[in-house]
Amino acid sequence: MNAKGIEGKIAFITGAAQGIGEAVARTLASQGAHIAAVDYNPEKLEKVVSSLKAEGRHAEAFPADVRDSAAIDEITARIEREMGPIDILVNVAGVLRPGLIHSLSDEEWEATFSVNSTGVFNASRSVSKYMMDRRSGSIVTVGSNAAGVPRTSMAAYASSKAAAVMFTKCLGLELAEYNIRCNIVSPGSTETDMQWSLWADENGAEQVIKGSLETFKTGIPLKKLAKPSDIADAVLFLVSGQAGHITMHNLCVDGGATLGV
């Protein structure tokens, strides 16, 4: 995809050290965006940024934990000062703590929400203040199709992603008068380390693709998992000029797993 209006834009990306976040960083960088890569893991983050620089891309590493609002405010100010005005924010950082509701600990519940929901709030609030002053910007939150479909052992994850989805829509409504667009990309099962950690072997992926009446899952009509690049391409579209009149939209990228509902 040759995206309109991405070259030279500064993109703040959380969770950029691996998986979907890394794919988003690489995809936007390939279109000429300048990447402010944010992640709590400094070693992995530096590897991604070094790789991008070796390819001739513009990228800088900003290690930070999205759960820490003061740290995110500080990083946002640094990016504005050292790289320039932030044009794009992509909230990707996320965690998955599976478990039946009565087996979930307080820590597991709170840890899930602190990253998947509060982390989105912290980064969005911090960055959007600068965007409001300029009356320009685009924010995309990577949610999950689990936010709209009940799943066993996924209560914490699904609920936290549902909160992030609705928060982003509310943010989009409040920021519309400032010409700031806010959208969501909701992946289904995707080939990431986080996804593979749920399965004992490759049969896990096959079962997800097939579906199961016992677990109330419909399967994936396209008969394959998403690749991180599939999600990144959807993000690219929503932050580009091609999506200039789209806001508060939830784009589901799940191979039809939620049957378009």
UniProtKB/Swiss-Prot annotation:
Organism domain of life: Bacteria
Keyword Nucleotide-binding set for record: no
Gene Ontology molecular-function annotations: 2,3-dihydro-2,3-dihydroxybenzoate dehydrogenase activity; oxidoreductase activity, acting on the CH-OH group of donors, NAD or NADP as acceptor
Record: residues binding substrate: S144
InterPro entries documented for this protein: DHB_DH (IPR003560), NAD(P)-bd_dom_sf (IPR036291), Sc_DH/Rdtase_CS (IPR020904), SDR_fam (IPR002347)
Residues that coordinate or bind NAD(+): 12-36
Coiled coil spans: none
Catalytic residue list: Y157 (proton acceptor)
Pathway(s) where this gene product acts: Siderophore biosynthesis; bacillibactin biosynthesis
EC class: oxidoreductase
PROSITE patterns per UniProt: ADH_SHORT
GO BP term (any one): siderophore biosynthetic process
Catalytic activity reported: (2S,3S)-2,3-dihydroxy-2,3-dihydrobenzoate + NAD(+) = 2,3-dihydroxybenzoate + NADH + H(+)
Induction comment: In response to low temperature.
UniProt similarity note: Belongs to the short-chain dehydrogenases/reductases (SDR) family.
The protein's name: 2,3-dihydro-2,3-dihydroxybenzoate dehydrogenase
Provenance organism: Bacillus subtilis (strain 168)
Gene that produces this protein: dhbA
